[in-house]
A protein has these predicted regions:
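Extracellular/periplasmic Venus flytrap/periplasmic-binding protein
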Residues: 129-176, 181
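Periplasmic-binding protein-like
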Residues: 53-61, 81-83, 174-185
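Extracytoplasmic "Venus flytrap"
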Residues: 1-20, 32-42, 62, 126-132
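An alpha-beta-alpha
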Residues: 17, 104-152
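Structural motif
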Residues: 29-48, 156-172
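Non-catalytic positions within long, well-ordered alpha-helices that form the structural scaffold/packing
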Residues: 50, 111, 172-173, 193
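Solvent-exposed loop/turn segments at secondary-structure junctions
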Residues: 2-5, 37-38, 63-66, 85-89, ...
Length: 195
């Protein structure tokens, strides 16, 4: 869904890929594909990767879930790992982390730091992981300051630096003095630094 150099989610996956390549060298072959939309194109790319002989395929975005399940049925000898999903199959597993725990702690810090009692949250898409994060952040903030209000602006995209920056500026305009984000670029941080 975004380029490997976007400084966020995809970058972290790419760092892990490079570490695996460094450890195993020519014992493994790694294929990467960037900027795959969460639509029928994902299904095409997954199928191509399986047809090329890849035995383990990482689908690194929630929106790939149904495409992974469909292609996995066609290639029972290929293993698929799907990020942040919740559906599985004999050859499909999910991987994730407890992101909400860190977001709760970030909320506590934000709640203790704000002067306006208005916190901003730039969010990509209303999927379970993002909603958990918003809720955890809000609960963390309200645990130290019950007067906190968290305002959310949705970008409807994981990676759109322009929309992310505009969302941050909108929240600043609404009085938010601490802003966090669940998107893939550093545009929110840059917009806040410029304000």
């Amino acid at each position: 869904v975004s380029p490997a150099n976007e400084e966020g989610w995809s970058t972290q996956h790419d760092i892990a890929r490079r570490a695996v390549e460094a450890k195993f060298g020519d014992k493994i072959k790694v294929t990467t594909v960037e900027n795959i939309p969460e639509n029928a194109d994902a299904e095409r790319v997954l199928r191509d990767l399986a047809q090329q002989g890849n035995k383990l395929i990482f689908a690194t975005s929630f929106g790939y879930m149904n495409s992974v399940l469909k292609v996995a049925k066609e290639f029972p000898d290929v293993k698929f790992e799907h990020a942040t999903g919740y559906k599985t199959a004999p050859n499909v597993a999910n991987y994730s982390a407890r992101f909400y725990e860190a977001r709760y702690l970030a909320g506590k810090l934000a709640g203790a730091t704000t002067k306006s009692n208005i916190l901003g949250y730039v969010a990509a898409l209303p999927i379970p992981e993002v909603l958990q994060g918003i809720n955890a952040y809000t609960l963390g903030a309200q645990s130290v300051n019950p007067n906190i209000e968290v305002r959310v602006v949705w970008t409807s995209a994981w990676y759109d630096p322009g929309k992310e920056s505009d969302a941050a500026k909108s929240l600043i305009g609404q009085g938010a003095d601490v802003i966090t984000h669940h998107t893939n670029s550093s545009a929110v941080a840059s917009a806040c630094e410029e304000a």
